C-alpha cells in the first residue's frame, strides 16, 4: 500500500464493484470505512446513470471496531436482499477494512441461510492486485460459480447454437468507450453473419450465464478484463477464444481472419476476405486517409504512447505501421502483464517503459519532447504543462472521455475515430506561427511550462521579450534548453544575453 498523488489503476475493490454493477440485478455490499465509498458518486457522474448505483457500504465505524463486523454485515446483506430482490449479492472488503482480518467467508455462509438470493465473497487479495486484475478475477469467479452449479444441476445446454455465435467478454461500466465499443462490435458481428449470444457483464443477468457455452467462440476485445473468463470457458467447455483487439485497420482485419479460422475449424464454411477488402478499400475512411497528403504530413513526427496494455499496444502499432509516425516511447502501467506488452510493441517503437509512476512518464516525455502524446488523463495534464498536445486513448480518464455522441475505438468506425483523434492531436507548426503573426480572438502571452510546478530561475523582461519572438511551436524547447544551460552555468536570472549564449552553446 502506498500514498500516491495519482494512480493509473485503482484499488482492487473498484474492479470488483465495476463488475458487479455492470450486471443487471446484482448488488454489491462493500465492507469499508467512510472514504472508500466514492465508487457510487464516480459511476453516477461518469456514466451519467439514470438509476442508482447498486452498491451499499457497510460502514466500518467505532462500533464495528469494538464489537466486530459480523452482525452489521449480515444485517446489511439481508436488508438489501429484502429491499432490492437481487439475483446475487457480492460482498467485498477494501484494502483498508482487510486490515481487520475478519472471516468474511463465514459471514457469507451465515447470510446464505436466510437470504433468498445467492451471496458471494469476492475472491480477491486486496494487497496484491489492482483494479484491473480484480475485475478480471471477479468476472471469472461469478461465471464459474453459475456454470459449475448449472453443471451439477444438469441444466447446462448441451449443444452449440445452429448458426455461428459469439460471447463478447469484458465490457464493463467505467470502461474506456466500452459502451460505444459494444455497439460497434455487435454491428461488426452482424455484418459477418454472427449472432451475439451474450455480452458479459454489461447489462447481462446472472441467469444468462448458463447459456455462455452455446456460443461458437469467445471474443475478448480488452486484455485487461475477460481473459481469465475466456480461459476458463476454453478449458472447461472447449470454447476457442479470439483475443486480438480490433483497433485500427490492420488489427481489425487480423481479428476477423482469426474469427474466420475459428469458425471454419468447427464446420462453418465462411470467407470474410471480400468483406475485409470492401471495408478497407471503400467503406472505411481510415485506409484512404493513410494515403492522403494529410497523413504524409505526419510521417516521421515523434510521438509518445502510454496507457493500459490493450490501448497502448494497439495505438503504437497504428501510429507506426498505418500512419508512419515515429513512436519514440511506448509504455504501459500494467506491470503484471509486461512481457506481453513488450512482445507486442517490439519493432514498433524506440523504447519501452513499464511503470505505474506518473513522474517517470512525465520525466520521459519532458526529456524526449515529442510532437504529440497519446496517453491517459495524467499524460494530458503533463502535455498541458509542457505545451505538447495530447490525445486521450486509455483509462483513467475524466468526464470528457465519456462522450454522449457515438465514438467507438474498435472496428472500422473505430478506425475512423482514431484517425480523427491522431490527426487533431498534432499541432501544425504553421498554425501557431500564423497566430503569433496575425493574432486572434484569444491571443495571450504564452510561456511553455516545465514539468515542475515552479521554477527556480528568474526570467528578466528582456529575456522574455526575446523568448516571445521565437515561433510558438519551438518556443517551449528553446525555453527548456535555456533554463538547462542557466542551471549548468550556476545562473539564477535569465536575460537576453543568457538566451543568446544558450543558443550558441547548443550550436543553434
UniProtKB/Swiss-Prot annotation:
- Name the GO terms of the biological process aspect: light-independent chlorophyll biosynthetic process; photosynthesis, dark reaction
Q: Which cofactor does it need?
A: [4Fe-4S] cluster
Keyword terms: 4Fe-4S, ATP-binding, Chlorophyll biosynthesis, Iron, Iron-sulfur, Metal-binding, Nucleotide-binding, Oxidoreductase, Photosynthesis
Please name one Pfam family that this protein belongs to: PCP_red
Q: Which residues form the active site?
A: 294 (proton donor)
Which annotated residues bind substrate? 429-430
Co-factor note (free text): Binds 1 [4Fe-4S] cluster per heterodimer. The cluster is bound at the heterodimer interface by residues from both subunits.
Tagged with keyword Ubl conjugation:
no
Q: Look up the record and name the pathway of this protein.
A: Porphyrin-containing compound metabolism; chlorophyll biosynthesis (light-independent)
Reactions accelerated catalytically: chlorophyllide a + oxidized 2[4Fe-4S]-[ferredoxin] + 2 ADP + 2 phosphate = protochlorophyllide a + reduced 2[4Fe-4S]-[ferredoxin] + 2 ATP + 2 H2O
Q: Per its record, what are the GO molecular function terms?
A: 4 iron, 4 sulfur cluster binding; ATP binding; metal ion binding; oxidoreductase activity, acting on iron-sulfur proteins as donors; oxidoreductase activity, acting on the CH-CH group of donors, iron-sulfur protein as acceptor
Binding residues for [4Fe-4S] cluster: 36
Question: Which positions make up the signal peptide?
Answer: none
Name the EC number(s): 1.3.7.7
Q: Which domain of life is it from?
A: Bacteria
Which PANTHER family would you find in this protein's record?
LIGHT-INDEPENDENT PROTOCHLOROPHYLLIDE REDUCTASE SUBUNIT B (PTHR33712:SF7)
Functional note = Component of the dark-operative protochlorophyllide reductase (DPOR) that uses Mg-ATP and reduced ferredoxin to reduce ring D of protochlorophyllide (Pchlide) to form chlorophyllide a (Chlide). This reaction is light-independent. The NB-protein (ChlN-ChlB) is the catalytic component of the complex.
Quaternary structure annotation from Swiss-Prot or TrEMBL = Protochlorophyllide reductase is composed of three subunits; ChlL, ChlN and ChlB. Forms a heterotetramer of two ChlB and two ChlN subunits.
* Similarity section: Belongs to the ChlB/BchB/BchZ family.
This protein is called what? Light-independent protochlorophyllide reductase subunit B
Organism encoding this protein:
Synechococcus elongatus (strain ATCC 33912 / PCC 7942 / FACHB-805) (Anacystis nidulans R2)
Question: Gene that codes for this?
Answer: chlB
Amino acid at each position: 500500500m502506498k500514498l500516491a498523488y495519482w494512480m493509473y489503476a485503482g484499488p482492487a475493490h473498484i474492479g470488483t464493484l465495476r463488475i458487479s454493477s455492470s450486471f443487471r440485478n446484482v448488488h454489491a455490499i462493500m465492507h469499508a470505512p467512510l472514504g472508500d465509498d466514492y465508487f457510487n458518486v464516480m459511476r453516477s457522474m461518469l456514466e451519467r446513470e439514470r438509476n442508482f448505483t447498486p452498491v451499499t457500504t457497510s460502514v466500518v465505524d467505532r462500533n464495528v471496531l469494538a464489537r466486530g463486523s459480523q452482525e452489521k454485515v449480515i444485517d446489511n446483506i439481508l436488508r438489501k436482499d429484502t429491499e432490492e430482490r437481487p439475483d446475487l449479492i457480492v460482498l467485498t472488503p477494501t484494502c483498508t477494512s482487510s486490515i481487520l482480518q475478519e472471516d468474511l467467508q463465514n459471514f457469507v455462509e451465515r447470510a446464505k441461510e436466510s437470504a433468498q438470493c445467492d451471496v458471494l465473497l469476492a475472491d480477491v487479495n486486496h494487497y496484491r492486485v489492482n483494479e484491473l486484475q480484480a475485475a478480471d478475477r471477479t468476472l471469472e469467479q461469478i461465471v464459474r460459480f453459475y456454470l459449475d452449479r448449472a453443471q451439477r444441476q444438469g441444466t447446462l445446454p448441451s449443444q452449440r447454437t445452429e448458426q455461428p455465435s459469439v460471447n463478447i467478454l469484458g465490457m464493463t461500466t467505467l470502461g474506456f468507450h466500452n459502451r460505444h465499443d459494444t455497439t460497434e462490435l455487435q454491428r461488426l458481428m452482424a455484418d459477418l453473419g454472427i449472432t451475439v449470444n451474450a455480452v458479459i457483464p454489461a447489462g447481462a443477468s446472472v441467469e444468462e450465464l448458463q447459456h455462455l457455452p452455446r456460443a461458437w467462440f469467445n471474443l475478448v476485445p480488452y486484455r485487461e478484463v475477460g481473459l481469465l473468463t475466456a480461459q476458463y470457458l476454453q478449458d472447461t467447455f472447449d470454447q476457442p477464444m479470439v483475443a486480438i483487439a480490433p483497433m485500427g485497420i490492420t488489427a481489425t482485419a487480423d481479428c476477423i481472419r482469426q474469427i474466420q479460422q475459428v469458425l471454419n475449424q468447427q464446420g462453418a464454411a465462411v470467407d470474410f476476405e471480400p468483406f475485409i477488402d470492401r471495408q478497407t478499400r471503400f467503406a472505411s475512411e481510415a485506409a484512404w486517409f493513410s494515403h492522403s497528403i494529410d497523413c504524409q504530413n505526419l510521417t516521421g513526427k515523434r510521438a509518445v504512447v502510454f496507457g493500459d496494455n490493450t490501448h497502448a499496444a494497439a495505438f503504437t502499432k497504428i501510429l507506426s505501421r498505418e500512419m508512419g509516425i515515429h513512436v519514440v516511447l511506448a509504455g504501459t502501467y500494467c506491470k503484471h502483464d509486461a512481457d506481453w506488452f513488450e512482445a507486442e510493441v517490439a519493432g514498433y517503437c524506440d523504447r519501452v517503459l513499464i511503470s505505474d509512476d506518473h513522474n517517470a512518464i512525465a520525466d520521459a516525455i519532458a526529456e524526449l519532447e515529442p510532437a504529440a502524446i497519446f496517453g491517459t488523463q495524467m499524460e494530458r495534464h503533463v502535455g498541458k504543462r509542457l505545451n505538447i498536445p495530447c490525445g486521450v486513448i486509455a483509462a483513467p480518464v475524466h468526464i470528457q472521455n465519456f462522450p454522449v455522441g457515438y465514438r467507438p475505438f474498435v472496428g472500422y468506425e473505430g478506425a475512423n475515430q482514431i484517425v480523427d483523434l491522431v490527426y487533431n492531436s498534432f499541432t501544425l507548426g504553421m498554425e501557431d506561427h500564423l497566430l503569433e503573426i496575425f493574432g486572434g480572438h484569444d491571443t495571450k502571452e504564452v510561456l511553455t511550462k516545465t514539468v515542475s510546478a515552479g521554477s527556480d530561475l528568474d526570467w528578466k523582461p528582456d529575456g522574455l521579450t526575446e523568448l516571445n519572438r521565437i515561433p510558438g511551436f519551438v518556443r517551449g524547447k528553446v525555453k527548456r534548453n535555456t533554463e538547462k544551460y542557466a542551471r549548468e552555468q550556476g545562473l539564477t536570472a535569465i536575460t537576453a544575453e543568457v538566451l543568446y549564449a544558450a543558443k550558441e552553446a547548443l550550436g543553434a
